[in-house]
Every structure is written in C-alpha cells, then in structure tokens.
Amino acid sequence: EMCIRDSGGIVSGIAAAAKLKNPRVKIIGVEPEGAASALAALKADHPVPLDEVATIADGTAVRQIGETTLEYIKQYVDEIITVSDYELMEAFLLLVEKHKLVAENSGILPLAGLKKLECRGKKVVAIVSGGNIDVLTISSMINKGLVLRGRIFTFSVNLPDKPGQLVAVSQMLADADANVIKLDHNQFKNLDRFHEVELQVTVETNGEEHIQHIID
C-alpha cells in the first residue's frame, strides 16, 4: 500500500488503520524530492526545517513535519520514498491519458512512486486523492508532460532571408508527418547575420524516434 505524505496526517492515519486491520501490510509513504521533510525528520530522529521547499506538489510542500505525525510514521510506516517533479508530470499524464482521471499533483505521488518499486506478483494499492487543481495547472501539466515525453518538440534553424523559405520548411515538416503548433519567424534576432533570419518551430511528434527523423 502506498500513501501520499503531506504534513504527515494522511499517511499516519491510513497506516495506523491498515496496520490495525492487518499488521503484515507494508505501508510506503511518498513525498516530493523538493519537500522531503519526513525523510529529513527520520534521519535526524526529530522534525527539522528544510532549507528550501521547491516542488510542483504544492499540497505537500511542507517545510517541517509535525512531531505527532512523525511518531506515527516511525511506528506504522515501513518506508518513505521520494519522487521528482519530472516523475510527477509523467504520472499526471499517465493518469489523464490512460485512466481518464484528474487529481492534484500531491494526490498522484503514490502513482509516481510505483515506478520505483518492484510490484510484480504483489498486491499493491496506490491511493490517489485530492482534486484541488485548476484548469490552467491541468493544461500546464499536460503540455509540460508532452514536452518531457518528446510529444511536443521545439527547435530553431537559421534560414536565408529570402522568399520561399517558410514554404520549404513547412513542406519538409509535412513530409515528416510533423504537425506544426507554432512558427516564429524573427528577422531581427541574429543581427550579426544580416542575410539570415531565425525560425523557431514547435511541432507535435510521436516521440523520440519521430524527432530524430525530423532532425535528420
């Protein structure tokens, strides 16, 4: 069983109830790398304030875990693991794309943590909870996740400053089955190259192999 780790209350409560029902169940808490206050407290054997908190999982962006919840964690939680913001974005995209569900960033910590465990042949429950997320954040998470997966790719190329170049590039991208999202044709960026312009292109792709095909 896997639980999120906020200020410690959720994982403490679930762990205590689960262990009461079945003492053999293993409880694993998951927290963001940029706010690993539970791990810091366990290493010091008492709550300690983090020097910095930086994570997209704002619901678990806790500088210091509570004393009471730390005692529950030490008693009932078998392990605490951490995940990166990159892994959180991957998990968010998986949840939306494959399972048609939306949860807040902190709520998908257990899903992101699954990749760090050997789950084959075991009964594992990843508790996904919390829907405190707005539409703009959802859009940002999806787009950034697509960029990380190579599904959205941006590149720049210098072109001769003469008519027909945009048509040639557009045709090349069409031949490579790349769907254009944005073209930025800037005549004034490379002032040291008077007869050239910079073209920045953003396209939809099918992944890394498709990107390599476009580059080649």
What spans do the regions from the language model cover?
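N-terminal glycine-rich dinucleotide-binding loop that anchors FAD/FMN and/or NAD(P) in oxidoreductases
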Residues: 46-61
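Active-site-adjacent helical/loop segments in soluble small-molecule enzymes
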Residues: 66-122
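Short, acidic/small-residue loops that bind anionic groups at enzyme active sites
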Residues: 21-34
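A conserved regulatory-domain signal marking ACT and ACT-like small-molecule sensing domains
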Residues: 137-216
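Glycine-rich beta-alpha junction loops
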Residues: 7-9, 31-36, 54-56, 64, ...
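Short Gly/Thr/Asp-enriched flexible loops that form oxyanion-binding sites at enzyme active sites
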Residues: 11-22
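Short, small-residue-biased leader/transition segments that mark boundaries at the very start
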Residues: 2-4
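Catalytic phosphate/nucleotide-handling subdomain of diverse soluble enzymes
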Residues: 115-143
